[in-house]
């Protein structure tokens, strides 16, 4: 895009406007500065509340994809890409799923997680190529993330996913963006002008993080990765998580610590399996069979 056209485009974006509440921020005390930032951050959950129906719709499509062997793939550049990678990386330890189930892709690759990669976000073809590199398929769901809603790298990825017939979702902080013209489900978290003009790592990034939390958490809940509000599929891979798994078994079954530890050992540190063993008074094999019959959802057994 020519420089003059880019200047005009940026001038029309809400995220590039000057915030009247922070015009004199460079003359304020530390407390006054953080107070302004905090007050602006309060706008984020209010903006998200307005798009909860679209977020729920995206969750339903993600669940359908998971149930059919598909994946959730995030793609973005800069802060947006980093947040996608972060959310994806938390899913295996939290929900006990394969790292392939939720993937995060950032423009410029692994190095871009820590260092800016010049021109990476401007490469539209690279978005397509990076999806091809992970063998993105029509069974998958693509979530494109960009505060501006116009990042070429993300647009290229969305267009390719759309061409394949996959479900596409856009997350942006500007309404009626180029991304929204492609995506099947449009999530526009319009948080307003940033405290520092154009610094979309702030309110826009916070909104993205909250939405991504919702997408994965709600989807995992719906496919049975929790019981009540307990992370029963947590991977007990360190001392803290082993202790958490013991507490989860105790809380879910109201059993003693001794019973929880013993049953967890028999269940090979699988908290969900240990819970089912205790609730149904079954051995490991019997509990595994029952969980399979209930599609991995403990609540289907306890509610009956």
From Swiss-Prot:
Keywords: Carbohydrate metabolism, Lyase
Domain of life of the organism encoding this protein: Bacteria
EC number: 4.2.1.126
Gene3D superfamilies tied to this protein: 1.10.8.1080, Glucose-6-phosphate isomerase like protein, domain 1
InterPro entries associated with the record: Etherase_MurQ, Glucokinase_regulatory_CS, MURQ/GCKR, SIS_dom, SIS_dom_sf
Function: Specifically catalyzes the cleavage of the D-lactyl ether substituent of MurNAc 6-phosphate, producing GlcNAc 6-phosphate and D-lactate. Together with AnmK, is also required for the utilization of anhydro-N-acetylmuramic acid (anhMurNAc) either imported from the medium or derived from its own cell wall murein, and thus plays a role in cell wall recycling.
Stated name of the protein: N-acetylmuramic acid 6-phosphate etherase
Organism expressing this protein natively: Glaesserella parasuis serovar 5 (strain SH0165)
Organism lineage string: Bacteria, Pseudomonadati, Pseudomonadota, Gammaproteobacteria, Pasteurellales
Gene name tied to this protein: murQ
